[in-house]
Amino acid sequence: MVRAGAVGTHLPTSSLDIFGDLRKMNKRQLYYQVLNFAMIVSSALMIWKGLIVLTGSESPIVVVLSGSMEPAFHRGDLLFLTNFREDPIRAGEIVVFKVEGRDIPIVHRVIKVHEKDNGDIKFLTKGDNNEVDDRGLYKEGQNWLEKKDVVGRARGFLPYVGMVTIIMNDYPKFKYALVAVMGAYVLLKRES
């Protein structure tokens, strides 16, 4: 068995020396790698904006952050949303909504809908795993949600795929390390 650092062993340090690799690149290679990285980022942004237009939702993909919707959805499930204004809101539907004063949208089921003669709709939500409805989550004095509060309606999901997002939010250093590693990979990757 050979131990790291033992006499006569050689550990390759060139793969670990990121700045040394950057210094070895000529300006054209470095420019190409930075441009490649910028194209990846801009492509991701264009895909996101395209999804916003196609789905009608300001946030077409969301992650379930709590267990309040179990057994329908679990913490870490990735939800795909649509939000077409002409679609009526129905009891039993799962919606993602924003509440004034809260930064993070909430994923819950519509349990009651009240429609007025003029077409205005008000509705009440509740998490499947919660004992009481969501009136305690709404802003003070608000008893019902309106269509303007809806970010989207759940149309599909991928189980547990969003756990990466939860881990990155729970452990911010992991998020920065992951971004740094991906950025270094893109910058240092050389065409064969």
UniProtKB/Swiss-Prot annotation:
Domain comment as written in the entry: The C-terminal short (CTS) helix is essential for catalytic activity. It may be accommodated as a transmembrane helix in the thinned membrane environment of the complex, similarly to the signal peptide in the complex substrates.
GO cellular component, one term: signal peptidase complex
Organism: Rattus norvegicus (Rat)
Keyword Transmembrane helix: yes
PTM info: May undergo processing at the N-terminus.
Main location: endoplasmic reticulum
InterPro entries assigned: LexA/Signal_pep-like_sf, Pept_S26A_signal_pept_1_CS, Pept_S26A_signal_pept_1_Ser-AS, Peptidase_S24_S26A/B/C, Peptidase_S26, Peptidase_S26B
Keyword terms of this UniProt record: Endoplasmic reticulum, Hydrolase, Membrane, Protease, Signal-anchor, Transmembrane, Transmembrane helix
Record-given protein name: Signal peptidase complex catalytic subunit SEC11C
Assembly behavior: Component of the signal peptidase complex paralog C (SPC-C) composed of a catalytic subunit SEC11C and three accessory subunits SPCS1, SPCS2 and SPCS3. Within the complex, interacts with SPCS2 and SPCS3. The complex induces a local thinning of the ER membrane which is used to measure the length of the signal peptide (SP) h-region of protein substrates. This ensures the selectivity of the complex towards h-regions shorter than 18-20 amino acids.
Residues on Cytoplasmic side: 1-28
Topological relation to the membrane, as annotated: Single-pass type II membrane protein
Active site: S68 (charge relay system), H108 (charge relay system), D134 (charge relay system)
TM segment ranges: 29-48
GO molecular function: peptidase activity; serine-type endopeptidase activity
Enzyme Commission number, as recorded: 3.4.21.89
Alphabetical GO biological process terms: signal peptide processing
Subcellular location(s) of the protein: Endoplasmic reticulum membrane
Region (C-terminal short (CTS) helix) residue spans: 177-188
Family classification: Belongs to the peptidase S26B family.
